[in-house]
From Swiss-Prot:
Residues 202-284 are annotated as: Disordered. Residues 246-257, 268-284 have a biased composition (Basic residues). Component of the organic matrix of calcified shell layers. Transmembrane segments: none annotated. It comes from the Eukaryota. It comes from Magallana gigas. This is Gigasin-3a. Residues 223-245 have a biased composition (Low complexity). Pfam families: choice_anch_I. The lineage of its organism: Eukaryota, Metazoa, Spiralia, Lophotrochozoa, Mollusca. Residues 258-267 have a biased composition (Polar residues). InterPro entries: Choice_anch_I (IPR055188), Mesenchyme-surface_protein (IPR052956).
Length: 284
């Protein structure tokens, strides 16, 4: 970099500084082959674009990483590898793509839009609520598929304490599409070979509502601030009724912790949104 050369900083490529950070070799490149700016890769957050103009009206900024560092510090930017201790992988993906927001699903709660964001590496789902014009987002809670940070990733998996790692895809099923008649969130974990069903409770009128107001004047783009008090995980457990698979077999799962309660306020009425653990299929 010209900036580093002028200041005689040869150690800028040291691993403890910027040496391990993956950056583009094309963006910021000058004619002489040097770079005056660095462009790192995405995967650390998510954005909302208008479908008609492709204008970006919201960006999560650094809130995904910051919230994971606060709520799940031992899983922060971790990477599941069978033979490695879970805590030893903490911060191991910070120089690459961080949490890697990989999958997304949308639900509706009255005039609010609920967005579920699946993060690949830590195996988590961040839940956000938006106003009707999708310009103001608030982090509500984070669900983690890792029920322990003790031992290796492989030991946690064998003990049934690890699910939904590498959330390649998530899908929200409204009541009229759900086999239970209740709102469901379907989550796949490619690393763990699992498919999980979660009951989504507390949604106000959870039917799809395509009348999202996109004509409201857009506010300047900015990252949403981290809530003053971050929701903590509840210690309550629940046992949902078994769900039949397509083969007709009943899949019985273990009890799981619920995520922390999430509160929304509509017309001075408080409603809670929380997961209820559903059943899982057999691991591949």
């Amino acid at each position: 970099l010209q900036w580093a050369r002028k200041r005689k900083i040869p150690s800028i490529q040291h691993d403890a500084l910027l040496g391990k950070l993956s950056v583009s070799t094309q963006e910021g490149r000058l004619r002489d082959g040097t770079h005056d700016k660095l462009y790192s890769y995405g995967g650390r957050g998510f954005s909302v674009l208008r479908s008609d103009t492709m204008e970006r009206i919201y960006d999560s900024g650094s809130i995904v990483e910051e919230s994971h560092a606060m709520q799940y510090p031992k899983l922060f930017n971790s990477y599941a590898k069978s033979s490695v201790n879970i805590t030893d992988t903490q911060d191991s993906r910070s120089d690459s793509k961080g949490p890697e927001c990989e999958s997304l699903a949308v639900a509706y709660s009255g005039t609010r839009v609920i967005v579920f964001v699946g993060c690949e590496r830590p195996g988590t789902i961040s839940i956000y609520s938006f106003n009707s014009n999708m310009t103001e987002g608030t982090l509500e809670s984070i669900y983690s598929g890792a029920k322990t940070v003790l031992g290796t990733w492989g030991e946690a998996f064998d003990g049934g304490l690890l699910t939904d790692m590498d959330t390649d895809d998530i899908k929200y099923l409204p009541p009229f599409q759900s086999p239970t008649g209740q709102p469901l969130l379907v989550v796949t974990g490619s690393d763990t070979g699992t498919v999980s069903l979660f009951h989504v409770r507390g949604l106000d009128n959870p039917l799809p509502n395509p009348r999202v107001n996109s004509r409201v004047p857009v506010k300047p783009l900015q990252s949403s601030p981290l809530p003053e008090s971050t929701p903590k995980s509840s210690t309550k457990t629940s046992s949902a009724s078994p769900i039949k698979s397509r083969q007709g077999k009943k899949l019985r799962g273990k009890k799981q912790n619920k995520t922390g309660n999430t509160r929304f306020t509509y017309r001075n009425n408080k409603r809670n949104i929380k997961f209820k653990a559903g059943r899982k299929n057999n691991r591949n």
